[in-house]
Each structure stands twice: as C-alpha cells, then as structure tokens.
Amino acid sequence: MNAIELSNVNYSSDQFNLKNISFKVPQGFVTGFIGRNGAGKTTIIRLIMDLYQPQTGVIRVLEEDMALNPIELKNRIGFVYPENYFNERWTTKQLEKMIAPFYRKWDHQVFEFYLEKFDLPINKSIKTFSTGMKMKLSLAVAFSHHAELYIFDEPTSGLDPLARNELLEIIQQELIDENKTIFMSTHIISDLEKIADYIIHLSDGEVILNGSKEQLLQRYQVVSGAIEDLDDELASLLIYEEHKRTGFIGLTEHAQVFKEILGHKVNITTPSIENLMVYL
C-alpha cells in the first residue's frame, strides 16, 4: 500500500515547471525527499496538500484522490512547514481553541502531553518563542490528531545542530516506533542518513532518483585513483567525474570493472546520500 502516489503530474508557473512527476511513497516507512533549493520540493508538497492544482496528472493520498476529498484527507495528515503559520499573538492555549474544531480526531490530552514534553508554555504568546520552540509547537499540533501520514517540509531549517538532532530524535521516537508514514523534504542530507528508508531526488522539476536507500547505496559506488590510470573506456563508465590534484573521483554503477582493470590502484567506497545528491 502507498501513502502517496503521483502519476504524470505536470505543473507550470511563470518561473518553474514540474515535468511528468511520478513516484510512490510506501506506507509505514520514512521517505526522504531531497533536492537543492529551488528544485521544486515545496511546490510538490503544496500540490499534494491541494494548495496548488496540477495542470495534468493524478495525486492520490491514502488511496484517495486528493482533489475529490481534500478536507477528509487533511484530517488524516500531520503537516509541518518551515515557516510558522500560526497567529503569533495567540498563546498555545488559544491556538488549540482555534484549530481543534478543524480536526475530527483532535486529542486534547495528547496536545497537553507534547506541550509538557517539549517544555512549551501555555500562556505565553507564540511570538516570544524561539525558532526551535515554534517548530516543536508545529510538531505538537501534527502529533495531536492521530494522523496516519506526516508531511514535513524542511522541518530542521533554521535550527542549530543541537536543536536539529533533538528534533530528529523526537521524530524517531514518536513516529517511527509507531510505524507511521513520514514524507520528509530537506536539503540537509545528514538528517536523512539517520532515519530514511526510501529516497526521492528531485532536480530542476524532474525525479532523477527514486528507490530504497539500501538499494540506491548498493547500486552506486564512488571510485577514485590516479588520473593517468583513467583511460577513455573507464571514463565512459562514470556518471560523474571530477579531477583533483590528488587524482580523479567519480560515481559509477560499474565498480567491479574498475576493480578488475585497476586492482589495488582504485579506491572503491559506498556513497552517502549527499554524494548521490551532488554527483547525480
């Protein structure tokens, strides 16, 4: 079963085009959505959330057409955006009073639990909160209506490394252990090295990589060695190639060929997700 399915989705604006976007987000796993700033990640999330409408294609969320049943489906989604979207004059108590009626399964006890867990004050206005506190408040809201799918758009953006690690630990503890579906967009790749099961890589409005993290990291290898050992035949097997003072470095799906020809002269390593994002 898939929590999200996009089939041949196209969307155009004055400055941006999404071209035949198709991918699936498996239910019960963490899918990392990566790409440079401006690649189109936020646009796709807004399409999924029915904030934008595609020119062509179909978007299904929790096995239903999002365009046909947006209100009910949004009740089943916990979402976190990078910017604060709450009225900053409100206190957390006032915030709950305003938003609870919109969620059929809103749980006051769960919300109170997370306010206490995250050490968020009840009677202070949101404008007094730090960036990290505002993000925790967004998570508390997302966690408090028994969602089945969580969509996070750059949840660690603007946080210092300590706060980022704390946030990732919260996501791991609260959601992964309960086998929830998480679709997490980020350009901070180290965030996904820890928690992602699947990776979707978007570049210039197109999906260029899609699969389980384990399979993708097994499929590609980073090779490096002396430039004089890199002949035209081997160079043709490189998806990415860079020359440095110390030699060449590249990405390939044919590491075994390099090993057979160059032997101990070539260094072969497993790439990181960040390597794949940079090299592909």
Which positions does each model-derived feature cover?
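Helix-to-loop junction immediately C-terminal to a conserved catalytic motif
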Residues: 49
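Catalytic Walker B motif of ABC-type/P-loop ATPase nucleotide-binding domains
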Residues: 150-154
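C-terminal coupling/interaction segments
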Residues: 238-280
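ABC-family P-loop ATPase nucleotide-binding domains
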Residues: 79-138
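Conserved beta-strand
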Residues: 6-9, 16-26, 33, 57
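Conserved ABC transporter NBD signature motif
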Residues: 57-68, 72-73
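ABC transporter nucleotide-binding domain
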Residues: 168-252
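Walker A (P-loop) phosphate-binding loop of ABC-type ATPase nucleotide-binding domains
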Residues: 35-40
